[in-house]
Amino acid sequence: MSTINTVSLNQDASCMSVALDTGYKIFQINPLKLRAQRQFNDGGLSIVKMLFRSNVLLLVGGGGNPKYAPNKLIVWDDVKERPVKELELNFEIKGICFDGKLLAIATASKLFLYQFGNNLKLQRCLDTQNPKGLCAMVTTVEKTAIVFPSRKVGQLQILFLFKDHMNTSIVPAHDSEISCLGISKTGSKIASSSTNGTLIRIWNSETGEKICEFRRGYQHTAVCQLAFSPDELLLACASKKETLHIFSLHGSPNTIRQLTSEEPYEEASEFKSSTTEPRQTHWKRKLLKLIDSGKRAHWRIQLYQSNPVLLHWLDEMTILICYKDAAYQKLKLTIEESSKSVEHANQHVCFHYDYTLEADGSLC
């Protein structure tokens, strides 16, 4: 079975490209269906990006035996079955963002912006501190928003590209290195996490202000995927703890409430001690405050395995998860009204948060 290196979406999220040690596969997302595939006998790929639903793909060599040097970007025509253009950099390519007209190439120390057309014309080159090649891009009618780690550890740099000018800002997001980024469909919100993996922070991309923050847990771990729901009301977070956390971005409205009577969040159990009652009471009060402020995950789901390579919302309540071993799951989130009422501050309607497994299978 082929190993998946990365999975990426096309510009309208109607298709996904799977980079393999043996080539690539292109899938229609909803319903999930294989549309094209190419197997290479001489090496694998680390990145595959599709231009909308066309035959044009961007390829970067990778895996155990790279087909191309990792500092080369290949523009591939799937109909002609050959490269039609290539771009060679002095740095290994770590990540790519592409909206059809603007191409952002992330390396460990630089972000290159190219105009995509008959010729790849360099527009800008910015210094970064970005060992993972993190980069997120959204293009609307008015502008293009790009976010990536800045030169200083823990900072985000946000670019807004308009037709006639560019705005840029720096956000001091975390104390340690940024490990994961997400951007909302409109580009108005940015999600970030650091290598600690305990806090997820949401930012207003235009003002740089922090909208809210969520605690994934108290144990350090790597957050590998962050994704906003299409309506930007929920944020999904997947980590190497083999868990999927889903938070509400609007506190705890009646339609998205957590049962206050359920067992405490498992990470809090680390703080239990033999000094007993005062300590436990303190953490119980703290957890209830987290629930009230919406900072506790409404859904906490055990994943098939750790470190998924794609987390994508198919609609406001359905999530597609793809894993490195080519397995995938489709989860439908549910909210059911509880039969019991709980007294906490004021009487309120309680809801139970659950999910159903709609589909699972393999991409290879």
From Swiss-Prot:
GO terms for cellular component: cytoplasm; cytoplasmic vesicle membrane; cytosol; fungal-type vacuole; Golgi apparatus; phagophore assembly site; phagophore assembly site membrane; vacuolar membrane. Keywords: Cytoplasmic vesicle, Membrane, Protein transport, Repeat, Transport, Vacuole, WD repeat. Pfam families: PROPPIN (PF21032). Disruption phenotype: Impairs atg8-processing. It is a peripheral membrane protein. GO terms for biological process: autophagy of mitochondrion; glycophagy; macroautophagy; nucleophagy; pexophagy; protein localization to phagophore assembly site; protein transport. WD repeats lie at residues 173-213, 218-257. It is found in: Vacuole membrane; Cytoplasmic vesicle membrane; Preautophagosomal structure membrane. GO terms for molecular function: phosphatidylinositol-3,5-bisphosphate binding; phosphatidylinositol-3-phosphate binding; protein-macromolecule adaptor activity. Involved in mitochondrial or peroxisomal functions and amino acid signaling pathways. Belongs to the WD repeat PROPPIN family. May contain a beta-propeller domain involved in specific binding to phosphatidylinositol 3,5-bisphosphate (PIP2), leading to the association of the protein to the membrane. PANTHER family: WD-REPEAT PROTEIN INTERACTING WITH PHOSPHOINOSIDES WIPI -RELATED (PTHR11227). This is SVP1-like protein 2. The lineage of its organism: Eukaryota, Fungi, Dikarya, Ascomycota, Taphrinomycotina.
